[in-house]
Amino acid sequence: MGYEEIARANHRNGNNCSASLFKAFAERLGMSAEEAARIAPAPRADGGKCGGYLAGRMLLEKMKPEAVEEFEKRFFEINGDNKCASLIMKRRLQGKNCNDLVGETASIIESLLQ
């Protein structure tokens, strides 16, 4: 299973967006999934920002800091915003949900790590 599938499965199993992504990349961080979930940023922290967005930034800051700016660019190209509430509303109108965002974010991170 790839990072996108793992992150989506984590989310379907009840993890929040941020923890889902951190757990998916735990091995790459050199820690257990439980340890990774504990250091994941809180959802809607930092002024209501999306947990997936915050997790993506933080994961890349730890694994490939020079890719953070490109991550932000790609995230905004896909989503147009990084605020949790507006992303939820926008995605509902598109027939998508947070699980889709988690998967897309994992895919962006994975592509930037290659």
Where are the predicted features?
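Active-site-proximal helix-loop elements at catalytic-domain edges
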Residues: 1-26
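Glycine/charged-rich beta-loop-alpha catalytic/anionic-binding loops adjacent to active sites
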Residues: 1-6, 32-42, 86-90
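Generic structural signal for well-ordered, non-membrane alpha-helical segments
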Residues: 14-18, 36, 46-49, 64-68, ...
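Acidic-glycine-rich active-site phosphate/pyrophosphate-binding loop
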Residues: 21-39, 76-84
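Alpha-helical support elements that line or immediately flank enzyme active sites
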Residues: 23-25, 59-63
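Domain-length accessory/inserted modules outside core catalytic folds
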Residues: 31, 45-47, 60, 79
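Glycine/serine-rich anion-binding loops at beta->alpha junctions
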Residues: 42-58
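C-terminal binding/interaction regions
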Residues: 67-114
